[in-house]
Amino acid sequence: MSIKKYKREFILIGIIILLVGSVLLKNVLKKDSNIESPNKISQKKNNDIFPDIDNLTSWIVYWDLNVDNEINMLNKKLSSISYFAVNFNQNNDLIVPEKLEMYYDKTKSYNYEKYITIVNDIVNDDGISLLKDKEILNILLSDELSREKHINDIIDLVKEYGFDGIEIDYEQIKDDLALWENYILFINELYSEALTNNLKLRVVLEGNTPIDKLNFTEGPTYVMMCYNLHGSFSEAGEKSNQDFIKELMDKMKEVPGEKSFAIPTGGFDWKDNGSTKSVSEAEAEQILIENKIEAKRDDKSQYLYFNYTDKENIKHEVWYADQVTLEYLSQVIIEEGYDVSLWRLGGNLFSK
């Protein structure tokens, strides 16, 4: 065989190798582009979830942070997430739970606004907790100097971590009008400082807030909790329904400015021995599988419910929300032109 012929064959083989290599490389790169980074939520919009909502807000909680899949499914519909929650120690210092701090560090780059929620819970060094403590509010809000210090502490914390906004969720004030007066002064003063520091402010209100006796001012976004219709304090039933939400929307008409209405995920499991525990949609579905039973849907609320007897021969009644329930509850809010908030992420399947 001549040298020229060898050269032609070598050149031909080289061209074939280059062509095959380029095809293989293209396929590898294509495959790699479809692999999600473990620290980055996909930004693909899922139009099957809450099709009428493009401005959904929600919460994540420090004791249940297995929520990346839910964020991924809701995706661009999520305009903001509140990180729940900062509490107080026995010295009235603001404390960020370690797990929440770690999750925030992981999700700083995610494409939604990030609020930090502050609650009036006290967690002592000995582990004893005082939930929704009214006394600490009296201490923090009783006079201008105390409010100023508390506001400065909040602003410093938010700026240190780089949150986009503040959410205040101080509860169990009930009919204490003197405390409400100081609380509203605090909200107004905090809003002014938040504006100065280019921060947003949300204020969460309970359904029993005596709105007709109070003078809220325009500025913050006010979020009404549209749940606790049934719970550990009551007989079995839905956590919310459209009539209940309509009542709260009517009540909130006296509050000026932007408003959002929060609907609940999950539900409760009532035992006939008197005890009750909260359940997520995923937990309720697991009970159905284990007991080989099916849930029924309540016509009025669109909640799912079922009964079962456990291994200890104790009877249970379970009511919980799924995607159908949440979309049904949100519809009445959307029709009035308000924003929807979802309490909370964690244990939701979002599968009709």
Where do the protein language model's features map onto the residues?
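Short, acidic/polar
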Residues: 62-75, 144-159, 206-213, 321-332
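N-terminal Sec-pathway targeting helices
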Residues: 2-15, 27
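Catalytic domains of carbohydrate-active enzymes, especially glycoside hydrolases
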Residues: 67-90, 154-166, 332-340
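Glycan-recognition patch characteristic of GH18 chitinases/ENGases
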Residues: 27-148
